[in-house]
Regions:
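Nucleotide-activated chemistry modules centered on ATP-dependent adenylation/adenylyltransferase
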Residues: 1-292
């Protein structure tokens, strides 16, 4: 079975389990990136009942937001239900710019509260499909599987690392409430994704055509320093919004009597972009202790 057929089989299995367990169609997550574009195409080819959902992060590039709207319009014309979920935190509307002052620290590679709030809340108590791939990072290779049962209690989590995993029966019969995930293209390489995109003539986010390697949140700490610098040169308004949010974060820290060695939002931004300590200022360990 080739990778396309295997991915389709995974989607068909997930759709069956979704209807059986949740009495709802499979929820396909869509970010406007190349992986989720392939994911939707595979779901269509699989002939399953599914809907498409985008989590509006508030920090995506404008071009990506417009592309998502265009694609959703085209999908809906083909009878696919699409929806955009706006983020909420503590039962209130949220954004990257409100979240930073509330969390009292910048989002970092070690503390990615932004992902948890702005992206990963979508699909609670549903079966979702994502475009996660092992080739994207060593961490994903270690911690992500073909299918997953997510639970706050790590002891109750189930991750199937292969299609014939010995935990498969446990996964299918699990009665605990929670989110289930299928990652149909988890074993695809970058070349696999692009080859499929070109062979099937799939729409492509225009930012890739500009040479962008990724189309996620602008300024994401998981991106390299050079990529982040280029992003802020390309979209300077986002740099201003981060600096403003960091300034409000400092005000919130002072109001709570927390250490506040930074003087301005620009100081925080410089520290954040360097991903290192500016002399005399809070370390990452200090911030993580506060978060805990």
């Amino acid at each position: 079975m080739d990778k396309e057929q295997l991915a389709i089989a995974r989607l068909q299995d997930a759709a069956r389990l979704s209807e059986h367990r949740y009495k709802k169609p499979l929820m396909v997550t869509y970010s406007g990136g190349k992986d989720s574009q392939v994911l939707v195409a595979l779901a269509e080819r699989a002939g399953i009942n599914f809907e498409v959902v985008n989590s509006h992060t508030t920090a995506d590039a404008p071009e990506t937001v417009y592309f998502i709207r265009e694609q959703f319009k085209a999908m809906e014309e083909h009878g696919i239900k699409c929806s955009i979920v706006m983020p909420r935190y503590k039962d209130e509307p949220a954004s990257m710019w409100t979240l930073i002052p509330q969390k009292l620290m910048p989002p970092t590679r070690l503390v990615r509260y932004c992902c948890a709030v702005l992206k990963e809340n979508t699909g609670r108590d549903r079966f979702i499909a994502t475009g996660v791939r092992w080739a994207e990072s060593t961490n994903r290779k270690k911690n992500r599987g073909t299918m997953e049962f997510n639970h706050r209690d790590k002891e109750k989590r189930i991750i199937l690392m292969g299609d014939n995993d010995e935990k498969r029966q446990l996964f299918e019969t699990c009665s605990i409430k929670g989110k289930m995930t299928v990652n149909p293209i988890v074993d695809w390489s970058d070349n696999d994704v692009w080859d499929y995109t070109h062979s099937e003539h799939l729409p492509v986010n225009p930012l890739y055509c500009e040479g962008q390697k990724r189309v996620g949140c602008i300024g994401c700490p998981m991106a390299g320093r050079g990529d982040r610098q280029r992003e802020f040169m390309r979209w300077p308004a986002y740099e201003k919004m981060y600096i403003s949010a960091f300034g409000r974060m400092l005000d919130a820290r002072k109001a709570k009597g927390l250490p506040c060695d930074w003087q301005t939002g620009m100081d925080v931004f410089r520290w954040w972009m360097e991903d290192d300590n500016i002399n005399g200022q809070l370390s990452m360990d200090d911030l993580m202790e506060e978060e805990q």
